[in-house]
């Protein structure tokens, strides 16, 4: 058998493996490589570039406010923004999480992994804000973590649950603010516009921002256009009814290696069932 046939068989095997793997393992390098397609029509690339330029074509500070803007102090005290907080893993990373229960925060598995199973390394700071002068405000305090459920949805799903301790007065965070209302991603369709809320660390430290995102496909989870940077991992995705329908995960190759797209985990029936079972 010549080398070209051997290579073809190997590539076919890899493709079959990737198709059979979980749709949500978006951090996996092999999956990212397989998003890079060898043949993409000029029309597809043009459409993608137009969307990409709309959301990323200018400096973030110059994006229209309806596409990307800081959440002001007044709104940070309102739903759903007050359910959003900074997930801080000491000495490792800073990301985002969403309060979904009295003591439960939903974030990404790849963020929770940084703690190596040690809850003492993690804290949750809802509605934290650091102004441009470096002054930091934590209106609901800083919550220590009691338990990390790193893979409650399975190893292939980029979601994790963090269970919080009550504050020093014995008050749970969910007694101070209403947790996010859990919706479903089942009713979403291509072209829908949603709101992504989180803490884009690479843009501004400890400043909550909202982004308008536009779904481009529901294949292999949620894919969408919208301004995101590191720190947005774990950001909540909300529909127009204020229901949590997904969690932002990452940005990976899309049409080819030069074109990226945002990926998120939708809250479908399976995810919603596990949330209901594990929520506290």
UniProtKB/Swiss-Prot annotation:
Keywords: Calcium, Hydrolase, Protease, Serine protease, Signal, Toxin, Virulence. Residues 1-38 form the signal peptide. The keyword Hydrolase applies. Its EC number is 3.4.21.-. The active site is at residues 110, 158, 233. GO terms for molecular function: serine-type endopeptidase activity; toxin activity. InterPro entries: Glutamyl_endopeptidase, Peptidase_S1_PA, Peptidase_S1_PA_chymotrypsin, Peptidase_S1B, Peptidase_S1B_tx, V8_his_AS, V8_ser_AS. It is an enzyme of class 3 (hydrolase). GO terms for biological process: proteolysis; symbiont-mediated disruption of host cell-cell adhesion. Gene3D superfamilies: Trypsin-like serine proteases. Has serine protease-like properties and binds to the skin protein profilaggrin. Cleaves substrates after acidic residues. Exfoliative toxins cause impetigous diseases commonly referred as staphylococcal scalded skin syndrome (SSSS). Belongs to the peptidase S1B family. This is Exfoliative toxin A. The gene is eta.
């Amino acid at each position: 058998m010549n080398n070209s046939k051997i290579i073809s068989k190997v590539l076919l095997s890899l493709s079959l493996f990737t198709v059979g793997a979980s749709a949500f393992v978006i951090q996996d390098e092999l999956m990212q490589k397989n998003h890079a397609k060898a043949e993409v029509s000029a029309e597809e690339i043009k459409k993608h570039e137009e969307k990409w330029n709309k959301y990323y074509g200018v400096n973030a500070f110059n994006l229209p406010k309806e596409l990307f803007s800081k959440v002001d102090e007044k709104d940070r005290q309102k739903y759903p923004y007050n359910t959003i907080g900074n997930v801080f893993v000491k000495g490792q990373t800073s990301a985002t999480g969403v309060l979904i229960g009295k003591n439960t925060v939903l974030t990404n598995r790849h963020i929770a992994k940084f703690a190596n199973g040690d809850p003492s390394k993690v804290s949750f700071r809802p509605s934290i804000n650091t102004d441009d002068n470096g002054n930091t405000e934590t209106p609901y305090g800083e919550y220590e973590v009691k338990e990390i459920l790193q893979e409650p949805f399975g190893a292939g799903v980029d979601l994790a649950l963090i269970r919080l301790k009550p504050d020093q007065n014995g008050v749970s965070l969910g007694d101070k603010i209403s947790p996010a209302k859990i919706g479903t991603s089942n009713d979403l369709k291509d072209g829908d516009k949603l709101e992504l809320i989180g803490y884009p660390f690479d843009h501004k430290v400890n400043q909550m921002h909202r982004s308008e995102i536009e779904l481009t496909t529901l294949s292999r989870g949620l894919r969408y256009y919208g301004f995101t940077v590191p720190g947005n991992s774990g950001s909540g995705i909300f529909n127009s009814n204020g229901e949590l329908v997904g969690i932002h995960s990452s940005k990976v190759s899309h049409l080819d290696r030069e074109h990226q797209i945002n990926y998120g985990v939708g809250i479908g029936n399976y995810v919603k069932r596990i949330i209901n079972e594990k929520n506290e």
